[in-house]
Amino acid sequence: SVDTRAPGKADDLEKSVNYGELCHFIQEFMEEHTYKLLEAVLENLAEAILQKWEKIEEITLEVKKPWAPIGLPLETVSVEITRGWHTAYIALGSNMGEKETYLRNAVKELDESAGCRVEKVSDFIATAPYGVTEQDEFLNGALKLRTLLTPEELLELLHEIEAKAERVRTLRWGPRTLDLDILFYDNL
């Protein structure tokens, strides 16, 4: 989906998506890439389009394969998907070592991850530990993220970033180099 009101009111192509460019992009993408599954074509094409055209919030694509080798008298087989950007809010925390460095590196890594765009980052604030109180204070913050990832994929990415920061999960509410939590994901 694209916001058509502003370009429609202004009659200004710069405020819209140039559908000619989009069609040529799709043609070139299909000519340059080979996939075994229709699903793979659609997943990769949708991500490429959404990454390239920021004005496109959501896209529905369908690929049809005529004369698919299924052994039945069908003219065509098709697969359709809808993919789009999601908004997530992530909490960041650290209470070991170079706390601010861990947090800034996590923000950078998220922003550089495929299908992720960090839109806003809060200030970092020092807070007292909860639960296990005999440990160093935490440095905490939050960020707003636009992502193409599902909640499960995003959680997996957060765990990978924590692992790179040598996060060890031994004690609930215990000390950690980096703690990343999904606070909100769209309206879930």
Protein language model regions, located:
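Core catalytic alpha/beta fold that binds nucleotide/phospho-ligands
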Residues: E31, K36, E57, W67-A68, ...
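N-terminal, polar/charged subdomain of small-to-medium soluble alpha/beta proteins
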Residues: S1-A88
